[in-house]
Amino acid sequence: MNKKILETLEFDKVKALFEPHLLTEQGLEQLRQLAPTAKADKIKQAFAEMKEMQALFVEQPHFTILSTKEIAGVCKRLEMGADLNIEEFLLLKRVLLASRELQNFYTNLENVSLEELALWFEKLHDFPQLQGNLQAFNDAGFIENFASEELARIRRKIHDSESQVRDVLQDLLKQKAQLLTEGIVASRNGRQVLPVKNTYRNKIAGVVHDISASGNTVYIEPREVVKLSEEIASLRADERYEMLRILQEISERVRPHAAEIANDAWIIGHLDLIRAKVRFIQERQAVVPQLSENQEIQLLHVCHPLVKNAVANDVYFGQDLTAIVITGPNTGGKTIMLKTLGLTQVMAQSGLPILADKGSRVGIFEEIFADIGDEQSIEQSLSTFSSHMTNIVDILGKVNQHSLLLLDELGAGTDPQEGAALAMAILEDLRLRQIKTMATTHYPELKAYGIETAFVQNASMEFDTATLRPTYRFMQGVPGRSNAFEIAKRLGLSEVIVGDASQQIDQDNDVNRIIEQLEEQTLESRKRLDNIREVEQENLKMNRALKKLYNELNREKETELNKAREQAAEIVDMALSESDQILKNLHSKSQLKPHEIIEAKAKLKKLAPEKVDLSKNKVLQKAKKKRAPKVGDDIVVLSYGQRGTLTSQLKDGRWEAQVGLIKMTLEEKEFDLVQAQQEKPVKKKQVNVVKRTSGRGPQARLDLRGKRYEEAMNELDTFIDQALLNNMAQVDIIHGIGTGVIREGVTKYLQRNKHVKSFGYAPQNAGGSGATIVTFKG
């Protein structure tokens, strides 16, 4: 898009509004490079990124990014083979740290579905080894001792030598106190010296490094520390050499990853920019607009971002509408309306949020052109009219159906009659070429053009005749009218003069009366619309609050359920462990006394959960009422425990059901829906175990035929427990064939029971698939 429109609309000032929300220099650079695009996929991506970041902020309102400096130049130097200094390494260290924090944040992020942002988070690289290498550089700007063993050794020796120097000097301070001007150790030329009185300079052997301005003090490095100081100087040289070697070595390690680190820095900046956009949305109540596919524009309560206390207006530029002509006097806000439309489009096509209400839509234009303000050139000696016309001629040669055109005071600066005619001719040319145009003018002739011409619409800026001030409200569909008579009358002009003037333009008065009626209708519609918007805003706030509360309740519910599951698992584990111990004790005894059996049964009973009476539970009763049977439902006949399907309902309310090969007529109380079986309260029945003797030891048989499914499963559970208590090796379970429901339940139960060694169907002469023989572990 041409740079001139960005300058005219002051787009750089708009971008500056986002700067306070940025945390990184990379994000700042990307913001400054931001420009509008006509590529729909890029705009959609930017909109999707903002929406996902908004969702992220709902779950993580304090999401932040570590501040980083620009490292493009640093990475370029690395790629060129240069070695980095400590300050440059610290910049890289900061970027790697920011990258790692973002990766950790993304890994731990929950309850947010990301697509576009996920791509950026997942593209960040992980450099654990490099991060370890860069720990050698302290944030204060020095290399740590642990950077290398040699550096640590050199610094230990320096420390020891410096300690010796201090000890020697402290001794001399005490011994030669009368020879010194003051009792301190001074420093000159990087050497530790004593401030000796000039009269005693020959009393202390050493090297003179300085003399005070008065000549009374001579700074002498005692001979006892000269050798130590020279050793320290040599060690300092070794230290500098080792630090250079470390810088070179780490530069070589980082060099192969320079491009990846630079890319990570760009991603960090991009995420920072998206974050800044959302912070702007929160601060200014901005929105992410919808994207129109046909250049349709619908802006709801749109504001100019650079105007303080700007009045919000609605603008609708339909698909078929080619021109909106804003008529009326100056100083009413017409130019601001032009800029608001243009700037909103530029912001949206740059991937920025707009200052409007939810539901706003923007189009996509390849170019936006504008002729706004007095751009005459003094050097070219052009008049206002010539300047505007030169610009318009240039624009008319460039615009096409994919352009948006903004024209301020079209035809101004020349004879009104000729200017109006020229303005209409230009608008007609643009209309025929189907170029969307918004134009302002104070020529009344263009009102008629807007009314009579298809696909052209009048508009105006509201003027309050009571206060004699513009309200800056945009009234689309209502042409502007001159308020000269009302203003003159309120300012004190004679009513006679005003009356004479009004009689001379009776025809215009008729038009003004029509316009006045339109204004009143528009104002009434606007009031109703404002009320609707207030209700919508309240609903949105309530919806957000309810959604937040719902999410919090869900999280709390899940937390409580997890706790309950853990507690239940612990109880079950404890119960199983205790029951195993009881059974183990029973198995270890060859003969059991009656009272021991009773005690063991009592212990096992204590392990069973307490019964809960659900018959009075209103929630379950209500749920049961809701589950009305219908044709096609699977049922279980209570008297037989057989499974069937409802085929029809008789007039008397009874049901016909197909149970296997048998057709039955049942009342609703005689069957249960299959899906409700799990909800019925468990009823435990006493099961009698019939012992019989054989060569293999005691055996027992349980007959489940004719039982309901739940009843059969409860009896089976009790039967197996008693069989284990009686130390039986094998039992028979008769379940019949039927629909196979009970047989399947028996099989699943035996598969779960860890005391069962094996099980299988009985021989054909003993019941076949209608009975199961169970063998227990010894």
Curated annotation (Swiss-Prot):
BP GO terms, sorted: mismatch repair; negative regulation of DNA recombination; rescue of stalled ribosome
Range of residues in the leader sequence: none
Pfam families in UniProt: MSSS, MutS_V, Smr
Gene Ontology MF annotations: ATP binding; ATP hydrolysis activity; ATP-dependent DNA damage sensor activity; endonuclease activity; mismatched DNA binding; ribosomal large subunit binding; rRNA binding
Quaternary assembly: Homodimer. Binds to stalled ribosomes, contacting rRNA.
Functional description taken from the UniProt entry: Endonuclease that is involved in the suppression of homologous recombination and thus may have a key role in the control of bacterial genetic diversity.
Xref: PANTHER family: OS10G0509000 PROTEIN-RELATED, SMR DOMAIN-CONTAINING PROTEIN
Name of the molecule in the record: Endonuclease MutS2
Organism the protein comes from: Streptococcus pneumoniae serotype 4 (strain ATCC BAA-334 / TIGR4)
Gene, per the UniProt record: mutS2
